[in-house]
C-alpha cells in the first residue's frame, strides 16, 4: 500500500497520526487558538471552517488560513468545511461548498482539503482533479452521527472514495451498540487487507467507539482525532493521552 506524504509527515506507516480540529469563529479567536494549539503534540491541524462566522467573505477566510499557516508552518493544514447534513455547524449550497474549497486550493495555504463523498459525483471528481493539479491532497469523507451501516456498505463507501482518487478515504460512524464498533473495525480490517491501495481513516464515535480511535494500527486506520481543547466529535480524547496510548500499542 502506498503512503501519503504531506510536508515531512508520512501517513500510512507506523503509529496512526494525530489530527486536531481548530474551531474558531473569527480572526481574533483563530489567532489565539493557533497560539494555544502550537504547543500541543499532534501531527495534522484540521481547520473546521464551518465554525467560522464570516464565511461569505472569502478574503477573511483566507486571511485566517494565512494566520494558521504562519503560526504553525511545519504542520500539515487540512481545510474542512463540514456540511450540516454530516454534523457541521452551517448549511451550505453545493455550489458555495465547491467554490470555498477551490478558493482554499487556489490560496496555496492549505496542504489538504476534506471533500464529502456525497457532495455529488461530478463535483467530487472535478474537485479532486483540481486539488491534485495544485498539489493539494484530498481526504474524502463520510459521517453518520446516527447509525453504523453493515460492513459491506462501509467498505463500499471507502472503495467508492478510492475510485474517485481520494488520497485518504475517511469514514466516521455512530455506534448504537458495542457490536457496531466491531462492525466498523471488521470493515476497516477487510478494507485494509483486501482493497485499500492507500491509507484510510475510520472511527466509531462516542464513548462506545473510543477503542476504534486507539487501535488504528491494529485494524488499519492511518490517523485518529484528538482534542486539544473542545472535542470536534463525540468520543475524542486529549492529544496527550492519545499519543501515550498510540505509542504503547506501536511499541508492543
Swiss-Prot record:
Pathway(s) the chain acts in: Metabolic intermediate biosynthesis; chorismate biosynthesis; chorismate from D-erythrose 4-phosphate and phosphoenolpyruvate: step 3/7
One of the GO BP terms on file: 3,4-dihydroxybenzoate biosynthetic process
Record-listed E.C. numbers: 4.2.1.10
Enzyme class: lyase
Keyword Isomerase appears in the UniProt entry: no
Family the UniProt entry places it in: Belongs to the type-I 3-dehydroquinase family.
Record-given protein name: 3-dehydroquinate dehydratase
Organism in which the protein naturally occurs: Escherichia coli O6:K15:H31 (strain 536 / UPEC)
Amino acid at each position: 500500500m502506498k503512503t501519503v506524504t504531506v510536508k515531512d509527515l508520512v501517513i500510512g506507516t507506523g503509529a496512526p497520526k494525530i489530527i486536531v480540529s481548530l474551531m474558531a469563529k473569527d480572526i481574533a479567536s483563530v489567532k489565539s487558538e493557533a497560539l494555544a494549539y502550537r504547543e500541543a503534540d499532534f501531527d495534522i491541524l484540521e481547520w473546521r471552517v464551518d465554525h467560522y462566522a464570516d464565511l461569505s467573505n472569502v478574503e477573511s477566510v483566507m486571511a485566517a488560513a494565512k494566520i494558521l499557516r504562519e503560526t504553525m508552518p511545519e504542520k500539515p493544514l487540512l481545510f474542512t468545511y463540514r456540511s450540516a447534513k454530516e454534523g457541521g455547524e452551517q448549511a451550505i449550497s453545493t455550489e458555495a461548498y465547491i467554490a470555498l474549497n477551490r478558493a482554499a486550493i487556489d490560496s496555496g495555504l492549505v496542504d489538504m482539503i476534506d471533500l464529502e463523498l456525497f457532495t455529488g459525483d461530478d463535483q467530487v471528481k472535478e474537485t479532486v482533479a483540481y486539488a491534485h493539479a495544485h498539489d493539494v491532497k484530498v481526504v474524502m469523507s463520510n459521517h453518520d452521527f446516527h447509525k453504523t451501516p453493515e460492513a459491506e456498505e462501509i467498505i463500499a463507501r471507502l472503495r467508492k472514495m478510492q475510485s474517485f482518487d481520494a488520497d485518504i478515504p475517511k469514514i466516521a460512524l455512530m455506534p448504537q451498540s458495542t457490536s457496531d464498533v466491531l462492525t466498523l473495525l471488521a470493515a476497516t480490517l477487510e478494507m485494509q487487507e483486501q482493497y485499500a491501495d492507500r491509507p484510510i481513516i475510520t472511527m466509531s464515535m462516542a464513548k462506545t467507539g473510543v477503542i476504534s480511535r486507539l487501535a488504528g494500527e491494529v485494524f488499519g486506520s492511518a490517523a485518529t482525532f484528538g482534542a486539544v481543547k473542545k472535542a470536534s466529535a463525540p468520543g475524542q480524547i486529549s492529544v496527550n493521552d492519545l499519543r501515550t496510548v498510540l505509542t504503547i500499542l506501536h511499541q508492543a
